């Protein structure tokens, strides 16, 4: 039986590779990204195996809505990959308060919101 994956940050890098690997083994994927244009081509390439959704993981309401839409479309979710995130590079004393807050919003709260949304 194939699995249904929910992958954040699927527009590039590891997220995109996770999508391609899951589809290659016969699974279906909800591919999310802040900019939906970054994942639409995956649906074109893989057809019904990929549902592209726009999702800014820092928006708790959007995370709940995306999970609801994904579940309505595929009937369930089996695997969640909280891949959306980014790093800050450079001297720590040069990181601004806003940069730190943005990183915490995505890398910590984004994971929390998506995980809470998929739990029963």
Please name every model-derived segment:
Residues 48, 69-82, 88:
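A glycine-rich helix->loop->beta "capping" turn
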Residues 11-12:
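Conserved glycine-rich cofactor-binding loop
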Residues 4-7, 80-81:
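Conserved hydrophobic beta-strands of the Rossmann-like cofactor-binding core
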Residues 55-65, 97:
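The beta1-alpha1 cofactor-binding region of Rossmann-like NAD(H)/NADP(H)-dependent oxidoreductases
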Residues 66, 81, 114-118:
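Hydrophobic positions on the long internal alpha-helix
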